[in-house]
């Protein structure tokens, strides 16, 4: 079981680890402070004490809001992409435009999808989905 990201004309399949790596790369491309904060999200998953976990996420979420204010809303759509549920979400064409501005000049040869498959998802495949979301006006989704 994993994540399928799809637009009107394209799709990619990834495991949850690949999806996390993809979103981490988008965070890195967005801004250094967004990247550093996004990497800390995993820390909360390691907290077993309920009160510690609640305190961590209260502070963590406040920092997300602070970052959004720092960038005067220019990164709001990117932050939405980073923090939407792993299980199911939709990004409209406006979100696609914001994400595309961050990722358009980047490419790599990392396997984000299932490496044994001939259609293993790469970053270029994700860019096609985001661009298709803009061109079609339908955005993209994952589940």
Identify the residue ranges that each predicted region occupies.
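Acidic (Asp/Glu-rich) sequence patches and key acidic residues
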Residues: 1-143
């Amino acid at each position: 079981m994993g994540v399928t990201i799809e637009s009107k004309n394209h799709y990619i399949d990834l495991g949850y680890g690949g999806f996390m790596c993809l979103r981490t790369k988008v965070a890195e491309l967005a801004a250094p402070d967004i990247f550093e904060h996004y990497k800390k999200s995993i820390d909360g998953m390691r907290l077993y004490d309920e009160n510690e976990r609640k305190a961590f996420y209260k502070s963590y979420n406040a920092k997300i809001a602070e970052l959004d204010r720092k960038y005067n809303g220019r990164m709001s759509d990117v932050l939405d992409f980073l923090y939407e549920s792993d299980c199911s979400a939709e990004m409209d064409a406006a979100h696609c435009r914001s994400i595309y501005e961050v990722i358009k000049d980047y490419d790599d040869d990392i396997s984000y999808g299932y490496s044994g498959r001939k259609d293993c998802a790469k970053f270029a495949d994700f860019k096609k989905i985001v661009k298709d979301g803009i061109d079609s006006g339908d955005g993209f989704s994952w589940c």
